[in-house]
Amino acid sequence: MPHYLSPAELERTAPAETGSFRSPVPTQIVSNGEFNPLPQTREQQRVEARIKEMADQLGPRHGVSRRGFLASAAGMAAAFLAMNEVYGPLFEVTAAEAQQPGAAAARASGLAGQFIFDVQTHFVRDDFKQDGLLGLAQYAKQHWNPAITRENDLYRFKFENYVKEVFVDSDTKVALLSGAPFDDPTWDLLSNDQIAAARVAINRISGSRRLLAHSVFTPKKAGWMEEVDRCIATVKPDSWKGYTIGDPLFPSKNGTFWRLDDEKLVYPFYEKAVKAGITTICIHKGLLPADYEKSWPGVWEYATVSDLGKAAKDWPKLNFVIYHGALRPFQESPDGVLAEFNKTGRIQWATDLAEIPAKFGVKNVYGEIGTAFATCAVTNPRFAAAFMGTLVRGLGTDRVLWGSDSVWYGSPQWQIEAMRRLEIPDEMRKKHKFAALGSADGRVKTAIFGGNAARLYNVQVKAALGAITNDKIAAIRSEYVAAGGERSNARYGYVARHTA
């Protein structure tokens, strides 16, 4: 996994798969490398301690070990009970789910058929050999965990583990595979051809349309428009992925940052996209390091949405999907960020995104929640509620999309469960005129989880579910569960080494 973090910042982190408790829900922020992970807060310490306590108490009642309990539906319920005890009743969960054998499993079984379309997933190519990535495990062996073996093994980020974590260990039905551009091509996770090849492989194996594909477009890079033409002709992506900030690792020395509303540079690409009928443009926004104003001078502005309104208005036939909800990762305490929201009603850059439809009179702007929701859910679920409320209020229920940024965070099932159970508190809804998120399979969450993406990608949900329910991956998952297979609860990013 590529990362923004400097050597000094890496010294303050540990690999999530070895440095954090394998809770059903992460008990501290896991960074995907695009931002600095906050130290574990006192509240998160309390949540972790309570989860461990319940696992020790309730595991024997279920006839399983602590590890077995934590990997079960009952363990997942226990994690949300613990979070409610610490943060207040933000998650819909009952004590019976954790305490009574079979109760949580029955609920999980009832929701297992839900249509979930994850529009942000990743893995790396088999021949990925960037020393900066392989060196993370070597560094971990030297500094964090001498017991690590096979430190040069990137299996956890590769194809087979991706299939297991996303399609077998979670309720995800359809996923969109993405990529990212870099000034140094040796950092490329997957080429456009490799993304398309993965789409062919998974759909051929499964016998259904399980995987969709991005093609990454890179304005200002040599030959970028020729690559667009080639992708339209031969790769035939389901949508496009762009990074207005250019290289997401470091401020581009090649000046590859750009604006969505650059009429001379980017509008000719939009013309080609409309003509080809590939009209969904996914854009990475937000998620900068803590010191972005100093470390990305003259570049960080390209991660904001200041360029979105005009482009969306000028190109009504295109759909602009802004990843991570444009949220800027906040390195101040969660309490301070929430206090600022309570005072002003605004969330930096995310509120700007949510206001664009009203300000510009457009209906073609969408927000994907990705890493933004994942980090909010584990550090301060009340803020997660504010974030979701802000996007739904401004963009509309039908323009917020589900994405997990997996496989960096392991199986996305914990994120799915967090969204299924999250509700915006009554007083927050009244003060900010937010709509309720509703039940796990209610109108709002059904739209977010899959209905909205299905509409963008021309997926007929009933037909898709019919095919998916009977495909090869569904059979593999059934056999896996019957044989006692369970989630690893592993995450693959970074966590802070110290507590707050």
PLM region descriptions:
Residues 3, 56-63, 83-121:
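C-terminal segment of N-terminal export signals and the immediately downstream linker at the start
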Residues 164-171, 192-208, 228-236, 272-275, ...:
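Acidic (Asp/Glu)-rich catalytic clusters
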